[in-house]
């Protein structure tokens, strides 16, 4: 497979680029060709107030009680129509009823239809007052949507809301194909709720029954309904055979849940995956609780652990209440560091180094906002479990613009840092940052002059263990005060470029910024939350080198850059390119001996960055970026991608990602950046392709190769067949799943997945390419 997937990808790329548009019409349109439509004018109003029209070759009767019609009988009332060889009409006075009860018995080639359903059989009956209808020993077909079957007795009730089948069957396959069907002793199709309820249900593939349930629900529309969803299965080297049987629970209009028993053969148990979604006055949210009672593989690999229970809890919430209160939750926690290596989960990945648990409550009115939050981290490292949490953190902003020619702002923060280890330093930090801006602008440019005053106080505790092992000592009480001054100027020049194309416009946008921050020795402050910020072109113009407040680097620098853009006649950006640099008049320092490049005493032009985007045509696009930092030795990061995209099912993308080992060490936490797989940095080339290969077949492939390690990083191949009544998807993925320190080699997980989807029950007729692309561990991202 290691050699075959790149070869297959090359074939897919070539065919995607040069294939013709000779595919058949959209699958949904094809499927609807086999579905009857209602072709008579739709009649509105109360059916009982509408006249009854009867046409027949012969008629006789005993007026007003009975009448018999024979020969091509055709009875119409409103949208309902009944045809038969013979029809007997009966009319009887009912005690207490203002209208007589009119019923119809139909014999021979009975055909009933309205704008909802068609019923056919040898014998029928109808109540013209209630529109109740029976047809014996016949078949039915939904109108305007897929769905048909047979029954010993078919009944229309509730003014055509319900179709009830005695000893009946149901399938969404088109006439002439019974690939799958469900048969039951009673089937009730509720058009209003868009659901089919089946008692004593047997699910059949062709003529063979393969599943029985005393009760089953099938959705027959896009409306939310409780019931079992389609099961799926896969095989992986991590868990062997896996089987999923999801159940959807429509709890209320503002909340629902999906409960999925997930059987894993190698683990010897069932994981219960529970996803709950809700909408409240305080916002919308999603919770996930996955629980595996015991794991025999984990027991063998971790014999000293007290429990082999595995679990995940995820909660995401975002909302606004009363227009002033903000509530946000971003919480992920797992039972152990190996969880995402052992189990696939959309709320985390084996490439993650940690999980975040954050809660925040905010209050915002004009010119003022405040947020109280707590933030914790769960580190996925067996060797280093040290991490800091903010318990709690208060952030306050006050704005007052148009104070004469000035804009003003005061930012304040108070936070208490706690470590997961008892011997590590802890601190309370209070920060105050008043800012004054003088913004000036006109039609062709702007200049913003800004002055800040940065005042921070630290009260550090629990320093004995750290100070006894380091030459640089931490102080219990530290005050750091520094000013900051910045001038940022931009200009925009524009011209028409008729030589390129009529209506095209080019801009030239030079930008220059001077930043001054004096040096303050911060070696007596522990680093609680600062790390080097990742840079692109826009990042060159940040006034901070580090995130957080523990490390504020000195600056005496000029940043210059230029951006050029090209817009077409519809004002769509077709091309842009940006190039910029930072020139240091003095070395940027914090006094932290752990930051290695501060010892080099480098000045001059040290950091370069560039970004570009080119929408070559409606189908071709290119993106790229590069950062050069001499402090980190040569190129720090780079990325590029080129994509051909005809539509969502036909695309090819080639991409490359690079990060130097020095850059990873500087930007990621130590426990993560020193992992074996990152010691040589990242140099990864990849290809993604998808296309329909026939009328109803589609294929997706992805391949990523690490040029540093000369090893495959990830590969995926998926094939889907889609028809009008079912879709089958088979996928293979080989992904990097960790590092074996004992054997010094990468650990891979191989997975083979199998999924079946019943079609015609909803409006989804997609070829499945986007779902397969998103399921990869390195998901596809659109370049266009």
UniProtKB/Swiss-Prot annotation:
Cellular location(s): Cell outer membrane
Post-translational modification: Contains two intramolecular disulfide bonds.
UniProt keyword annotations, A-Z: Cell outer membrane, Disulfide bond, Membrane, Signal
Cysteines paired by S-S bonds: 31-724, 173-725
Signal peptide start and end residues: 1-24
One cellular component (GO) term of this entry: transporter complex
PANTHER family in UniProt: LPS-ASSEMBLY PROTEIN, LPS-ASSEMBLY PROTEIN LPTD
Task of the protein: Together with LptE, is involved in the assembly of lipopolysaccharide (LPS) at the surface of the outer membrane.
NCBIfam families listed in its UniProt record: PRK03761.1
The name this protein goes by in its record: LPS-assembly protein LptD
């Amino acid at each position: 497979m290691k050699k075959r997937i790149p070869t297959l990808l090359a074939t897919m790329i070539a065919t995607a680029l040069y294939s013709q548009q000779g595919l058949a019409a959209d699958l949904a349109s094809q499927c609807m060709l086999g579905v009857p439509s209602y072709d008579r004018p739709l009649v509105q109003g109360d059916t009982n107030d509408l006249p009854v029209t009867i046409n027949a070759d012969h008629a006789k009767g005993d007026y007003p009680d009975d009448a018999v019609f024979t020969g091509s009988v055709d009875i119409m009332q409103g949208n309902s129509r009944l045809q038969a060889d013979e029809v007997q009409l009966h009319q009887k006075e009912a005690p207490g009823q203002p209208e007589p009860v009119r019923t119809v018995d139909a014999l021979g080639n009975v055909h009933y239809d309205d704008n909802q359903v068609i019923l056919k059989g040898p014998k029928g009956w109808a109540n013209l007052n209630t529109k109740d209808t029976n047809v014996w020993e016949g078949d039915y077909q939904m109108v305007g949507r897929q769905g048909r079957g047979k029954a010993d007795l078919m009944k229309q009730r509730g003014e055509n809301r319900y179709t009830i089948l005695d000893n009946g069957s149901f399938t969404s396959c088109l006439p002439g194909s019974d690939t799958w069907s469900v048969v039951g002793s009673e089937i009730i199709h509720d058009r209003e709720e868009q659901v089919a309820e089946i008692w004593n249900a047997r699910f059949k593939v062709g003529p063979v029954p393969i599943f029985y349930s005393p009760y089953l629900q099938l959705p027959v529309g896009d409306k939310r309904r409780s019931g079992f969803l389609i099961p799926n299965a896969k095989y992986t080297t991590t868990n062997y055979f896996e089987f999923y049987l999801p159940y959807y629970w429509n709890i209320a209009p503002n909340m629902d849940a999906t409960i999925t028993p997930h059987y894993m053969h190698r683990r010897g148990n069932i994981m219960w995956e529970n996803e709950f979604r809700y909408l409240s006055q305080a916002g919308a949210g999603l919770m996930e609780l996955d629980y595996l009672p015991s794991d025999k593989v984990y027991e063998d690999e971790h014999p000293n652990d007290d429990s082999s229970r595995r679990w995940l809890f995820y909660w995401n919430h975002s909302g606004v209440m009363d227009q002033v209160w903000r509530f946000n939750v971003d919480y992920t926690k797992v039972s152990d560091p190996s969880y995402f290596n052992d189990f696939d989960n959309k709320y985390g990945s084996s490439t993650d180094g940690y999980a975040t648990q954050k809660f925040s409550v905010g209050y915002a009115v004009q010119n003022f906002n405040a947020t109280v939050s707590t933030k914790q981290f769960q580190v996925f490292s067996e060797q280093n479990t040290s991490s800091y949490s903010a318990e709690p953190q208060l952030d306050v902003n006050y704005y007052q613009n148009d104070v004469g020619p000035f804009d003003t702002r005061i930012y304040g923060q108070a936070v208490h840092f706690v470590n997961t280890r008892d011997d590590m330093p802890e601190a309370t930090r209070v920060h105050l940052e008043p800012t004054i801006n003088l913004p000036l602008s006109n039609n062709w440019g702007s200049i913003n002059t800004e002055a800040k005053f940065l005042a921070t106080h630290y009260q550090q505790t629990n320093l004995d263990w750290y100070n006894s092992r380091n030459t640089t000592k931490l102080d219990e009480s530290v005050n750091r005060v520094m000013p900051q001054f910045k001038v940022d100027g931009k200009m925009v020049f524009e011209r028409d470029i008729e030589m390129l194309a009529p209506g095209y416009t080019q801009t030239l946008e030079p930008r220059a910024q001077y930043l001054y921050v004096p040096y303050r020795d911060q070696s007596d402050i522990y680093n609680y939350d600062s790390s080097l910020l990742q840079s692109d072109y826009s990042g060159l113009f940040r006034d901070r080198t580090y995130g957080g407040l523990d490390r504020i680097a000195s600056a005496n620098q000029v940043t210059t850059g230029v951006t050029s853009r090209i817009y077409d006649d519809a004002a769509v950006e077709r091309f842009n390119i940006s190039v910029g640099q930072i020139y240091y008049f003095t070395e940027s320092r914090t006094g932290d001996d752990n930051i290695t490049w501060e010892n080099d005493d480098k000045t001059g032009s040290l950091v370069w960055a560039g970004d570009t985007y080119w929408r070559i045509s409606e189908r071709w696009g290119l993106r790229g970026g590069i950062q050069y930092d001499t402090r980190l030795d040569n190129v720090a990061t780079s990325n590029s991608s080129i994509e051909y995209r005809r539509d969502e099912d036909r695309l090819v993308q080639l991409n490359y990602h690079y990060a130097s080992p020095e850059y990873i060490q500087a930007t990621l936490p130590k426990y993560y950046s020193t992992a074996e797989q990152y010691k040589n940095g990242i140099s990864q080339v990849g290809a993604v392709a998808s296309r329909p290969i026939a009328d109803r077949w589609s294929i997706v492939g992805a391949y990523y190769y690490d040029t540093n390690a000369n090893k495959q990083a990830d590969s995926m191949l998926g094939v889907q067949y889609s028809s009008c009544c079912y879709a089958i998807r088979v996928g293979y993925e080989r992904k990097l799943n960790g590092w074996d320190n004992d054997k010094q080699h990468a650990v891979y997980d191989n997975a083979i997945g199998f999924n079946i989807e019943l079609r015609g029950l909803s409006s989804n007729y997609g070829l499945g390419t986007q779902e397969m692309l998103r399921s990869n561990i390195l998901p596809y991202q659109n370049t266009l």
